[in-house]
Regions:
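Structural motif
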Residues: 102-104, 138-139, 164, 197, ...
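Metallo-beta-lactamase
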Residues: 15-133, 225-236
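Active-site metal-binding motif and surrounding structural segment of the metallo-beta-lactamase
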Residues: 118-166, 182
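Active-site environment of divalent metal-dependent phosphoester hydrolases
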Residues: 146-150, 172-174, 190-193, 207-209, ...
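Sec-dependent N-terminal signal peptides
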Residues: 4-13
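Active-site metal-binding loops of divalent metal-dependent hydrolases
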Residues: 108-110, 145, 204-205, 236-238
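Active-site-proximal loop/helix segments of hydrolase catalytic cores
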Residues: 153, 207-245
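Binuclear metal-ion centers of metallo-dependent hydrolases, dominated by the metallo-beta-lactamase
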Residues: 179-195
């Protein structure tokens, strides 16, 4: 009995020391939390379809013409700037970024609906290009796992699975299951070099969830992209907090 208690004591001490050595956003239950000083998420969101539909009817859902990208113009510009650095908006949080010889895609979503089911929230504007029309991608950045940023259909059908994939902690499995070979998970403030680019995952004030049981079990973050004298911050759905002061 004494031996059992001693072993149990050692396990508790070891786990305590291990947690003390982990960053503050790592919680003992294996989940993550926002940086210190971030606003707290209070209460539970009360969802009502009747309220949602009632409030939706009050909104002007007309899409401004300037918000709809002309596909031919986008393709023309991609060809025109293929040997130059550029940032091209595809839709929502999806951008094509070219720096030197490296082409980056961010949070690509090419599906009609964002959600676990085919009838989830539907986008109002199609992406400027289809998956088949995007240029060769060398680097795939994913900020977090919400359905309007992490699109399973896009990940599964993505034509350039030899691209480097960089994701926050515990998101790599969503890529390796579809035979991506170069998948790297980063914690906040970790950096990785890809060709001539330096990619750093920075904190964000957000959260993660894809089901009823996985709240905050995967990390989220912003990406700092550095290339020569250029710096680009690609931010996920982040709130404001002490980290931005």
């Amino acid at each position: 009995m004494k031996k059992f208690l001693f072993i149990l004591f050692l396990i508790i001490i070891t786990n305590t020391i291990a947690m003390e050595n982990k960053p503050s956003h790592h919680q003992s239950n294996g989940t993550f939390k926002n940086p210190a000083g971030s606003p707290e998420r209070t209460g539970k969101v009360k969802w009502s379809w009747s309220t949602f539909n009632k409030e939706k009817k009050k909104l002007d859902m007309t899409v401004p013409k300037s918000h709809v990208l002309n596909k031919n113009e986008v393709l023309k510009n991609l060809e025109l700037y293929k040997d130059k650095d550029y940032i091209g908006w595809i839709g929502h949080a999806t951008f094509l970024i070219k720096l030197g010889n490296t082409t980056i895609i961010t949070d690509p979503v090419f599906s009609k609906n964002a959600g676990p089911l085919i009838f989830g929230p539907k986008r109002y504007v199609d992406p400027a290009l289809s998956l088949k029309e995007i240029p060769k991608v060398d680097l795939f950045l994913l900020t977090h796992n919400h359905y309007d940023h992490q699109d399973t259909a896009t990940i599964r059908k993505f034509p350039y699975k030899d691209a480097n994939v960089i994701v926050p902690l515990k998101l790599g499995k969503y890529f390796t299951k579809y035979n991506y070979k170069k998948v790297n998970e980063l914690d906040w403030f970790q950096t990785i070099q890809v060709n001539d680019l330096k990619i750093t995952l920075l904190p964000a004030v957000h959260w993660s969830k894809r089901s009823l049981t996985d709240t905050n079990k995967t990390l989220w973050g912003n990406f700092l992209i550095e290339y020569k004298n250029k710096k680009i911050l690609f931010a996920c759905d982040t709130g404001y907090g002490q980290i931005y002061k």
